[in-house]
């Protein structure tokens, strides 16, 4: 009797598990069965020493439908957003200001190195003394950004941002929580390397606390429970480690470990660097060099060039006449090329020797000599042997690992007027960034569309064929209408600066700017998101089909298909006539 009972019990458990899984799938599907869309504003606000962090409630039905979360960071001048990473990719839109972005990509080398001369210059600027025992700094590439840029942050990659401008730096972050890179649940998480930042998504923290209360055994020791309560609020990833273990693992003293974990300091998401941030950067290096060279702009370089020419002429005069006679019809020429200034401020030169050989017909043959030999002598050892083998072996294709990971392009200015994809002088302009213009977006299945509508300009009805879209208003105000598959209007209201609106896939949407214009960015969950303008669809359908489908005359069908612009940017009829009259006058 035991075997049938166990069999039936096992079958019941399997059915319960299957129904639970199906229920989760249906819940995920039903999240996009939205009868009404809402304009979303930030729900949480964290004020730090160097700025403000705002987040949207990730449990909002619209955001759960799109599978994304949003953050907004306002960084004051000299503000530093502490290093952190997430388990999903991010797109950052720079709404205002300028600054620097640092990313520590795992497995990539530190390509920015500090020379001794540049170190002393930096220390002179700060009024510090150089210490010979301190090791010269090196780090990975520093990227600079400005208003209108979009930045792509890979998952699990620590990054930091710094505002070196004179105004506030405002950045809006999209976090793709349902990305395949995220192997955890879709609740947003951010892992900070430093500080004691506050929880950015308190709704997820409440859910975790409720689960822990249900899962906590009743007989748990009081000491262990007290220890867990003491660790609450320590939100950087180093705080949870044992100090002695961390000291041995990182080979540092206990005082340094204490500062890394800083259990008592309340340093939040954004700090202020009072003396300014000093890192290795060609942009900042050139600015320092220009300041130092104001006293003698070009005199020193001219003197060095003149002395070098005199030395070359002296060497040619001292050369034996027999060697010059032996050359006969051969003419030797030294070409010196300056390639700018190095990181340490010193000039470096590369010399190549070109030999011009005159044949019987007066033709010249030019060949470069000694360049490879000089490189071999300078490098020596393994490098020279490897270079020699590469020259002897036939050309082969590179694997592309370093080019695609360590030197990937992560920035593009989507708001630049010169790169507009669609433009109407009286209606506005549209620019897109996808995996064709910014290849790294193809890794994460994301893209963006920038829309700047002029006064009363219209972005005609259209829909996103293969992506959800999330609109963030940068400036101005506009009227937005969204219609679902049942033909019902799920949103028909004004959107203003700082608001979000989710437009699900294939929902038809239209925009019209107000008197002050309408500027927004639309993040999309496909690296090659495609829009289908309604007017273009009508033009692709035969006239007879439209006439019978809508009960229209052929004249009406002709007006429907061919009146107006070919692109979805439309100017109101009255404004278009006024514009034409002004142009004629």
Swiss-Prot record:
Residues 565-579 have a biased composition (Polar residues). Disulfide bonds join 32-65, 108-406. One of its GO terms (molecular function) is nutrient reservoir activity. Coiled coil: none annotated. Residues 37-258, 412-558 form the Cupin type-1 domain. Pfam families: Cupin_1. Residues 1-23 form the signal peptide. Residues 113-147, 199-240, 283-402, 565-585 are annotated as: Disordered. Residues 211-224 have a biased composition (Basic residues). Residues 136-147, 338-350 have a biased composition (Basic and acidic residues). SUPFAM superfamilies: RmlC-like cupins (SSF51182). Keywords: Allergen, Disulfide bond, Seed storage protein, Signal, Storage protein. InterPro entries: 11S_seedstore_CS, 11S_seedstore_pln, Cupin_1, RmlC-like_jellyroll, RmlC_Cupin_sf, Seed_Storage-Functional. Residues 309-320 have a biased composition (Acidic residues). CDD domains: cupin_11S_legumin_C, cupin_11S_legumin_N. Hexamer; each subunit is composed of an acidic and a basic chain derived from a single precursor and linked by a disulfide bond. Component of globulins complexes which accumulate in seeds. Sulfur-rich seed storage protein. This protein found in the seeds of many leguminous and non-leguminous plants is the source of sulfur-containing amino acids in seed meals. PANTHER family: GLYCININ G5 (PTHR31189:SF63), OS03G0336100 PROTEIN-RELATED (PTHR31189). Belongs to the 11S seed storage protein (globulins) family. This is Conglutin alpha 3. It comes from Lupinus angustifolius. The lineage of its organism: Eukaryota, Viridiplantae, Streptophyta, Embryophyta, Tracheophyta.
């Amino acid at each position: 009797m035991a075997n049938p009972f166990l069999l039936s019990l096992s079958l019941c458990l399997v059915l319960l598990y299957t129904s639970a899984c199906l229920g989760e799938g249906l819940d995920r599907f039903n999240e996009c069965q939205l009868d009404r869309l809402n304009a979303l504003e930030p729900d949480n606000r964290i004020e730090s020493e160097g700025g403000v962090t705002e987040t949207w409630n990730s449990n909002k039905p619209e955001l759960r439908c799109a599978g994304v979360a949003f953050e907004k960071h306002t960084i004051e001048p000299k503000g530093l957003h502490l290093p952190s990473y997430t388990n999903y990719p991010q797109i950052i839109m720079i709404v205002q200001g300028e600054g620097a972005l640092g990313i520590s990509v795992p497995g990539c080398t530190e390509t920015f190195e500090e020379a001794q001369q540049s170190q002393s210059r930096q220390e002179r600027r700060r009024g510090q003394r150089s210490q010979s025992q301190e090791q010269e700094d090196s780090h990975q590439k520093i990227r600079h950004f400005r208003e209108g840029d979009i930045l792509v942050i890979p998952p699990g990659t620590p990054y930091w941002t710094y505002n070196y401008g004179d105004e506030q730096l405002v950045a809006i972050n999209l976090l793709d929580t349902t990305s395949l890179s995220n192997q955890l649940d879709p609740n947003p998480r951010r892992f900070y390397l430093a500080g004691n930042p506050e929880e950015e998504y308190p709704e997820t923290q409440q859910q975790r606390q409720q689960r822990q209360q249900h899962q906590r055994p009743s007989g748990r020791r009081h000491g262990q429970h007290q220890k867990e309560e003491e660790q609450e609020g320590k939100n950087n990833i180093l705080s949870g480690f044992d100090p002695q273990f961390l000291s041995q693992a990182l080979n540092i003293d206990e005082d340094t470990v204490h500062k890394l974990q800083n259990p008592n300091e309340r340093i939040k998401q954004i700090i202020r660097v009072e003396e300014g941030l000093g890192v290795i950067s060609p942009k900042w290096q050139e600015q320092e060099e220009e300041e130092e060279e104001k006293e003698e702009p070009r005199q020193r370089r001219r003197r060095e060039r003149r002395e070098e020419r005199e030395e070359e002429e002296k060497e040619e005069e001292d050369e034996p006449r027999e060697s010059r006679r032996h050359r006969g019809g051969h003419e030797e020429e030294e070409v010196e090329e300056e390639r700018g200034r190095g990181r340490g401020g010193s000039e470096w030169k590369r010399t190549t020797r070109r030999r011009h050989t005159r044949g019987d017909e007066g033709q010249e043959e030019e060949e470069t000599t000694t360049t490879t030999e000089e490189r071999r002598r300078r490098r020596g050892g393994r490098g020279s042997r490897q270079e020699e083998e590469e020259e002897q072996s036939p050309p082969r294709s590179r694997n592309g690992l370093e080019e695609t990971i360590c030197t990937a392009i992560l920035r593009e200015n989507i708001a630049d007027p010169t790169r507009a994809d669609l433009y109407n002088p009286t209606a506005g302009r549209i620019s897109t960034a996808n995996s064709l213009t910014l290849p790294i977006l193809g890794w994460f299945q994301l893209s963006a569309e920038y829309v700047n509508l002029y006064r009363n300009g219209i972005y005609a009805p259209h829909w996103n064929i293969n992506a959800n879209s999330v609109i963030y208003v940068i400036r101005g105000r506009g009227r937005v209408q969204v219609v679902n598959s049942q033909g019902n209007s799920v949103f028909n209201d004004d959107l203003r600066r700082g608001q979000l609106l989710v437009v699900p896939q294939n929902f038809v949407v239209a925009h019209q700017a107000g008197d002050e214009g309408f500027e927004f960015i639309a993040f999309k969950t496909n690296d090659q998101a495609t829009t289908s303008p309604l007017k273009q669809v009508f033009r692709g359908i035969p006239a007879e089909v439209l006439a019978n489908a809508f009960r229209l005359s052929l004249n009406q069908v002709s007006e429907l298909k061919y009146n107006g612009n070919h692109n979805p940017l439309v100017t109101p009829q009255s404004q278009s006539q006024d514009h034409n009259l002004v142009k004629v006058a």
